[in-house]
Amino acid sequence: MTEPLKPRIDFDGPLEVEQNPKFRAQQTFDENQAQNFAPATLDEAQEEEGQVEAVMDAALRPKRSLWRKMVMGGLALFGASVVGQGVQWTMNAWQTQDWVALGGCAAGALIIGAGVGSVVTEWRRLWRLRQRAHERDEARDLLHSHGTGKGRAFCEKLAQQAGIDQSHPALQRWYASIHETQNDREVVSLYAHLVQPVLDAQARREISRSAAESTLMIAVSPLALVDMAFIAWRNLRLINRIATLYGIELGYYSRLRLFKLVLLNIAFAGASELVREVGMDWMSQDLAARLSTRAAQGIGAGLLTARLGIKAMELCRPLPWIDDDKPRLGDFRRQLIGQVKETLQKGKTPSEK
């Protein structure tokens, strides 16, 4: 049985000719071009972030200078001399049965012991603050690693430092999501998306509340000196609370070091970021025409507090920012503007009545 013939098919266009890939011609550089050659620069944001990290690392590391070694050696020698003299006085007082001198030696020993204990405690807290930077570097390495076996232990250590209980729902979801076939990058990424946002949300609430209090205080208070003292106290308290949320216990010197790092981070990042995030939006809304001078100053103080909180959050956070989850000033700006407007409207309503 023969099959029927198929109808003829006519093509309007010409047949496509097979095109071979074209390669670029070979380029050679002479000696003058080689001398003037400049490699391509990285993205400005990445370069700025790398410079900031380098500055933070240099600030956290103590400078091993000759003068520092001489001062430390002198203090150690003085401490040994004080201890030796105290032991000699104690022995002489015991032999001569001078109970008053013996009591004075005991009191001096207690004072010296308390001083040494406080120094050791401050050193431990300062060391813990430095370790947080190393943990952040370790987390960054794990996020680019394809190995196995280190990610889970690292994340469990972070959860323990932050005080997250094993029965916490977020930690339970993380345990249910990981398995043995996942590498360290996947395990740490799951922790960053399931557990870390719990602490970040608490830090955001602290920043939002402190920024709102600073804004309203400046907007309604007529005393500039009181405003400055209040803002300074609130900013220090905000940094302490953020550090506590992320499992860092601050002492006197570690608190000063963290506050110095926050200010250094803000100064090094420059005012361009502040202008980029806030300036254009302020110009579009024409806030200068809508708000009073005190209200505008209050918003500025609130944004400064928010910026301090964001930088403190960045320095105390054990993980680097992933997928652009870093909080921005714009996240707090609308809330501050709305609160100031609401406060001004409440102040005008009784006077109108």
Swiss-Prot record:
Name the domain of life this protein comes from: Bacteria
Q: What GO CC terms are in its UniProt record?
A: plasma membrane
> Which key words tag this protein in UniProt?
Cell inner membrane, Cell membrane, Membrane, Transmembrane, Transmembrane helix
Membrane topology field:
Multi-pass membrane protein
Q: Which Pfam families does the record match to this protein?
A: DUF697 (PF05128)
Q: Where in the cell is it found?
A: Cell inner membrane
Which stretches face the Periplasmic side?
1-69, 121-212
Presence of keyword Membrane:
yes
Keyword Transmembrane in record: yes
Regions that span the bilayer: 70-90, 100-120, 213-233
Side Cytoplasmic, residues? 91-99, 234-353
| HAMAP family with a match to the protein in the record | UPF0283 (MF_01085)
Q: Its family?
A: Belongs to the UPF0283 family.
Question: Which NCBIfam families did the record assign?
Answer: hyp_HI0043
Q: What is this protein called?
A: UPF0283 membrane protein YcjF
The source organism is Escherichia coli O157:H7
